[in-house]
């Protein structure tokens, strides 16, 4: 769906 499926809003930077 997005860049990060787990943390879309966090931009998968450091989730």
Swiss-Prot record:
Disulfide bonds join 4-12, 7-15. GO terms for cellular component: extracellular region. It comes from the Eukaryota. It is found in: Secreted. Keywords: Disulfide bond, Secreted. The keyword Disulfide bond applies. Belongs to the guanylin family. Endogenous activator of intestinal guanylate cyclase. It stimulates this enzyme through the same receptor binding region as the heat-stable enterotoxins. This is Guanylin. The gene is GUCA2A.
